[in-house]
Amino acid sequence: GTLAAAARVGFRPRLTRVTVLGDRQKSYKGKVLLVNPWIYDFAAHNLWIEPLGLLTIASVLRDNGYTVTVLDCLASHPGAPVARTDGSGRFFKTVLDKPATVAFVPRRFGRYGLPLDWFDAALAAAPRPDVILVASGMTYWYPGVIEVIKRVRARHGRVPVGLGGVYATLCTEHAQQHSGADQVIAGSGMAEALRLADDVTGNNSEPDRYADPRSWPAPAHHLVSRPFAGTVASWGCPYQCTYCASHRLQPAFVRREAGVVVDEIAGCLQRGIRDFAFYDDALLAGSGRHLAAILQGILSRALRARFHTPNGMHARGISGNLARLMRRAGVATVRLSLETLDPVRQQTTGGKVTT
């Protein structure tokens, strides 16, 4: 098929490598390989998925003089399903045997993303790193993490491997026992990722500067191949809903400056990106005033873009004025969150919606 034909003509996934230059060339500190793993599941749709945390770590490392390579298992490639005009779509799926624990599910289980041989070819083409950092998404996607670490171990031996992300934070003990990583980083990981790179290479980049999310640089969107970009207006969530792990992943609720978000979007627009997804857990917290400031900035600079809200928004935060502003600024996909129909539970979980 198309994949085989692409392989015959020597296609290999494109890797992007960047050494940071500022006002003057920064001292070379070392090479870091960042890996975004596969998804292992019964179904997976690309609703504007971008490894935002990993790309923020990439920016932190680059800003401190490291050479960064990103190997993205979810990157588009010849033979993969064609994306829709808004950037969303489907991933290439390799059907696998179902794990015993879910063997009863009447669906086809699979690995979503690059074929294994393409991953191995991309890994072989990348510069030999001093340290490897692997991201993780949903906890039950951990087989993708294990497969990535197994393959980077086979290629790079005892090069130190760090693992961060959602699975690493929520299932730390499981990750320590089963992932194969040398270090499991729980929490946001920006400072700890830089600290690990420094420890391995013998540098001191003062990683504690990145303990506060307000100090984080914009994600290095250009290091992955996507027809869209993810962004956040804020990190964390002010609510403490019992069914949600947001406060464990990011304990503090911190808003980014509206102008910084607009600058990030403008930079992506200059690279031809037109579709943007807000990843916020609480985009409309505070009656949507922060989102309104961002959208006003978009309009004042005449930026033409389309915005999507795959995480869902709290219905209570939408007013008539905000809805009209969202439409004028280009918000194209509006998803509203509904956790329960029980009025008592609606109030105890923050009153985000009423029915």
Which residue stretches match the model-derived regions?
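Extreme N-terminal basic, low-complexity initiation segments
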Residues: 2-10
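Intrinsically disordered and other compositionally biased segments
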Residues: 6, 20-23, 302
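Acidic, low-complexity intrinsically disordered segments
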Residues: 10-15, 21-275
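Short amphipathic alpha-helices and their capping/turn segments at secondary-structure boundaries
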Residues: 20-28, 123, 318-330
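Radical SAM [4Fe-4S] cluster-binding motif and immediate context
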Residues: 214-355
